[in-house]
Amino acid sequence: MAFSRRYWLVLALCLALQGLGQVRADLVVLHTNDVHCGVENQLGYAQLAQYKKDLMKNPDDTVQLVDAGDAIQGEPLGSLTRGQAVIDIMNVAGYDFAIPGNHEFDYGVARLLELAPQLAGGYYSCNLVDLRTGKTVFPPYKMVAYDGGKKAAFIGVTTPQTLISSTPRYFQDDKGQFIYGFSEDATGQKL
């Protein structure tokens, strides 16, 4: 009886492991967040870029590398270049989509607006609004087609608390009037 149980257990385990090799994802999303100028020490931007490249070898898969904010500030590399070096690294790594986190504003809105067009994958935010025009500062989302016509939307949402967790004067004009907002309200309905 013991042989029979062991046999079936080993067989089930082998079949389960065999199935793992056949798992296929049509849309692969690699995600970073709060890296503050550097992907974790165990990985690094170079290895992240290589991982994306390796995944892209499967022609059936669409691979997207996305960042959910706080990438360009936090270490001397970012501070000394006011974010430029990290944007350059993100381009080499192949980022496809980024959301401005509260620390993307640490060099001021004007600086972020200088850096944003340089990020090949683009910055996206559905709720960072120029209050003078009522329009979003960045595109709100990015559509990605995969698997012969399926679509996925990557939607950028910057935390409305950025207005107070960053430096409020960065979002004001010379007269102290807010010229940028985050569709903030107590209910979240403005998003």
Placement of each model-derived feature along the sequence:
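Positively charged, low-complexity intrinsically disordered regions
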Residues: 6-7, 19, 23-25
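Bacterial N-terminal signal peptides
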Residues: 10-18
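Bacterial N-terminal signal peptides that target proteins for export
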Residues: 1-9
